[in-house]
Amino acid sequence: MKKAVILFNLGGPDSLNAVRPFLFNLFYDRRIINLPNPFRFLLAKFISAKRENTARKIYEEIGGKSPILENTKMQANASELKLNENRNHVHKVFICMRYWRPFADEVIESVKQFDPDEVILLPLYPQYSTTTTLSSIENWQKNAKRYGLKCNTKMIHRYYDNQDFIEAHTNLIAKYYKLARKIGKPRVLFSAHSLPLSIIKKGDPYASQVERSVELIVEKLAINNLDWSICYQSKIGPVKWLEPSTESELLRAKADGVPVVLSPISFVSEHSETLVELDIEYKAIIKDGYYFRVPTLSTDPLFIKCLADLCINLP
């Protein structure tokens, strides 16, 4: 049996000229801004124009483009190798980005050429949110219908409590905790992408799933009297978002004079929000030598095993 696995990710501009259209696509998503047209279109145009210069400066810090596609390609290659250890089926992994290339319509044409017996949708979002997982799935389904991809399709919605996912995080955090311990008693900050409270109040389970991921990791770390906190980054705009902010927790750690071990708990690949926000902007808050940023899971063997097993064990 031939199986196509579709890895969903956010996407990112592949040049500085792509920054504004990328931002427009992001803010035009009705799962991000829930307004009817033409209001959503006009607001997306306004926000993307207003934020373009700020965003361009961010991408200039990391070579003029987002590394998310290259990172996702490495994850796709590693996952495909792992999946094809199972000789009963032939797996091919495709990358589908939500807000920049490759878009769903391009990927669907490639999938049709592969002609699979089954399609598996696998978001690179461990914790489910309507703004990420659901948005990607709905966009895929709409394009699959439009471009005539008729195939048995299965979906993976979440894996925030997957044993291998938890263990992969635990191992990385333990390594950096040991380094930080040489300075003093570290505080572990679990930094997740923030969401507006209005979305959470509508029943989005993202925050509760982030909390459960962290609970399981803390339990697995089994460090006596571990000092830890969940915090949220990347807020934009004036509305209320999930709190506390990562910045405020770093300022608190600075005031307390403790080393910080920061784990990007909701990110599985490196991009602007880790490489610039965490590694440059937030790092500058903490005293030199007191900041230990844990890498994203990327192609960690346990994480790749997690992704492969999710596909293999689907009913």
Swiss-Prot record:
Matches recorded under Pfam families: Ferrochelatase (PF00762)
GO BP, one annotated term: heme biosynthetic process
Molecular function per GO: ferrochelatase activity; metal ion binding
CDD domains the record matches: Ferrochelatase_C (cd00419), Ferrochelatase_N (cd03411)
Protein's pathway: Porphyrin-containing compound metabolism; protoheme biosynthesis; protoheme from protoporphyrin-IX: step 1/1
Main subcellular localisation: cytoplasm
Annotated InterPro entries: Ferrochelatase, Ferrochelatase_AS, Ferrochelatase_C, Ferrochelatase_N
Alphabetized Gene3D superfamilies for the sequence: 3.40.50.1400
EC number: 4.98.1.1
Catalytic activity as recorded in UniProt: heme b + 2 H(+) = protoporphyrin IX + Fe(2+)
Keywords: Cytoplasm, Heme biosynthesis, Iron, Lyase, Metal-binding, Porphyrin biosynthesis
Keyword hit for Oxidoreductase: no
First-tier enzyme category under EC: lyase
Gene Ontology, cellular component aspect: cytoplasm
Entry binding sites for Fe cation: H193, E273
Annotated compartments: Cytoplasm
Name recorded for this polypeptide: Ferrochelatase
Organism: Wolbachia pipientis wMel
Gene name tied to this protein: hemH
